[in-house]
Amino acid sequence: MAAVFLVTLYEYSPLFYIAVVFTCFIATTGLVLGWLGWDVPVILRNSEETQFSTRAFKKQMRQVKNPFGLEITNSSAASLATGVTLTTDCLEDSRLTCYWGCSVQKLYEALQKHVYCFRISTPQALEEALYSDYLHREQYFIKKHSKEEIYCQLPSSTGVEDFGPVPRSRYPLVALLTLADEDDREIYDIISMVSVIHIPDKTYKLPCRILYQYLILAQGQFYDLKQLFMSANNSATPSRDQSPADGSVEHSLLEKAGLAGAEVDPVEESSKDCVVCQNGGVNWVLLPCRHACLCDSCVCYFKQCPMCRQFVQESFALCGQKEADKDILETS
């Protein structure tokens, strides 16, 4: 029996040694990758490593007050033939200028001119940068703190029924909000806001929505205004009823426009708790997915977004530690 056991041990010992060496190699590789900041399985990480590497992604932000607000009212009823209703909410007296059929190329050239040549602080400045390459222009005076509904429509005299197939050379509607009083332009860093709005027509029936919003700063920069996404309660009701057939058609149109990835579940403003601990208030926004879902205590333990599982490249706090402590004192 002893001889048989020794022979068996001799035959299988190389496989045993190979398995041990391979296991040690995997464990060592995981630890080294963890030290270098690569994502490794949780079992090979410790809390100190995770906290240190994630904190390095913190992005410094500067708070800026935006004096402009623009939304679409009853977007389901908007079309090129019937027009669109816009709701404004501005902190100061402003002017709303609407450009129908604005050239896509000229618009982005105008934004670049704001950076290098002159500032787009008035409608006249934008029109000069556009070389008046648009079909129709409308302008309205907006009183501060008044949520006014502005009805805009492309005149039938232009003879335009659609803007052609995708990709298009003209945006259906570009809305510019500027400060009416010149003295107010010295108060705010943001001096104007450009909104690119899609309006359905006979050729392209994607529902009416704001495609892009650009904040124009007095210092010569412009930034794409992005929406932050927070977790929604399952009991929340959708903003509008939609059948499955309508949803599939809308999704196919979004894919053609390259916007299918931008669809997000409805957001409920009352949802403010951390999605992990369900205790602390949400204070951290993860980039590039823009999910606001973690509190100050939980943010240091995640390299991936807990909502969409996308890797976190950067993150920033919605408010500083002093402001958070002040809110806690007020609620207690």
UniProtKB/Swiss-Prot annotation:
PROSITE patterns for this protein: ZF_RING_2
Pfam families named among the record's database cross-references: zf-C3HC4_3
Protein name listed in UniProt: Cell growth regulator with RING finger domain protein 1
GO cellular component: endoplasmic reticulum; nucleus
A molecular function GO annotation: zinc ion binding
Transmembrane segments annotated in the record for this chain: none
Localisation: Nucleus; Endoplasmic reticulum
Purpose of the protein: Able to inhibit growth in several cell lines.
Record bears the keyword Zinc-finger: yes
Record organism: Rattus norvegicus (Rat)
Zinc finger boundaries on the chain: RING-type: 274-309
Conditions for induction: By p53.
Tissues/organs with expression: Highly expressed in testis, lower levels of expression is seen in skeletal muscle, liver, lung and brain.
GO aspect biological process, one term: regulation of cell cycle
The entry's keywords: Cell cycle, Endoplasmic reticulum, Growth arrest, Metal-binding, Nucleus, Zinc, Zinc-finger
